[in-house]
Each structure stands twice: as C-alpha cells, then as structure tokens.
C-alpha cells in the first residue's frame, strides 16, 4: 500500500476497520489452504521431505499453462506459514502441517475439512435457509468425512453419556 492510499484510509476512518478485517482473513486462508493441501495429497507428498517445484508440478499440473497457477498457490502456502521455500524446494513448515501428514491424525484433518466445507456452509447459509424455511438435511453432509472425523469426538460422546446415564 502506498502512502497516499494509507493516508486516505486514515482520513476516512477505515484503516482500523480494515486492519481488524484483515486479521480475520489470514487464519481463514490458512485453514482453506491447509485443507486443500491435504485433499490434494500435497501434505503427504511433502512428508518425505522437501520437493522441487518441478517434482510437485509433475503430478499436479496437466496443462503447462497452469504451472504459474500452481506456483501462486504454493506461494500462498508459504505466505500463510504452512510451507517453507528454501532455494527451489518446498517443505512443510508448520507443526500442524507436519502432523497432518501422519495417518494417525486423519481424524484431525477430517475435522478441519469439515469446518472448511460443511460448517462454513452451516454458518453462512443458515439465515437464508431459515428465512426460506429450508432446513439442512443429512444429504447436505459428507458422510465419509463425518465418519473420518468421528473417532476424535468419541471420547466426548462417551463422557456426555456417562454424565447422563448412571
């Protein structure tokens, strides 16, 4: 942002609002990028160590014209702190990304995917659906995803049952 733009935002009183809004954007992009990287197999691919752009492009880009698109998407991963780029090699940077690469943490990956896909719809669409009288149904859920995430919730369900059932 140049000085003139910053000055205009300050004069209009919007700078503080903009900064507050931007604090929400990065974690949201971080979540979406992490889920997309997991779904696409990138996290599993990088679990074994750093890979060059060429190695990643080989199995992720069918049309050579999309190589810049992949590079921009990988750069987003770097910017949101999930990837590291050293030289020309990408690796997993964050603790969370490295841990999601482990099969034992699939339920946690599924919870994140559920939040990024289903929960976002529940939150975003609820007011409109209520106004139209259109409830969510089981068909709005991804059963496989819910099944993948459910082992993580099992101890909480057991705890709730233990509190209610003698």
Segments the model singles out, each with a brief description of its role:
Residues 1-26:
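Long, low-complexity, charged/polar intrinsically disordered regions in eukaryotic proteins
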Residues 9, 23-28, 34-40, 44-47, ...:
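Conserved Class I S-adenosyl-L-methionine-dependent methyltransferase catalytic core
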Residues 31, 61-62:
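A generic structural signal for short
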Residues 49-60:
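Short acidic, hydrophobic short linear motifs in intrinsically disordered regions
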Residues 60-61, 165:
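A broad structural signal for alpha-helix termini and local helix breaks/kinks
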Residues 63-67:
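Short, basic interhelical loop/turn and adjoining N-cap
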């Amino acid at each position: 942002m140049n000085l003139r733009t910053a000055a205009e935002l300050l004069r209009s009183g919007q700078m503080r609002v903009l900064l507050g809004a931007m604090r929400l954007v990065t974690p949201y992009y971080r979540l979406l990028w992490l889920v997309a990287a997991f779904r696409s197999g990138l996290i599993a691919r990088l679990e074994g160590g750093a890979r060059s752009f060429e190695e990643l492009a080989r199995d992720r880009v069918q049309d050579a014209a999309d190589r810049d698109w992949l590079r921009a998407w990988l750069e987003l991963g770097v910017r949101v702190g999930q990837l590291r780029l050293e030289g020309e090699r990408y690796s997993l940077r964050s603790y969370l990304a490295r841990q999601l690469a482990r099969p034992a943490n699939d339920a946690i990956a599924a919870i994140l995917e559920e939040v990024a896909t289903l929960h976002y719809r529940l939150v975003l669409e609820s007011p409109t659906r209520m106004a139209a009288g259109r409830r969510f149904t089981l068909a709005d859920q991804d059963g496989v995803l819910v099944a993948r995430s459910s082992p993580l919730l099992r101890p909480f369900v057991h705890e709730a049952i233990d509190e209610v059932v003698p």
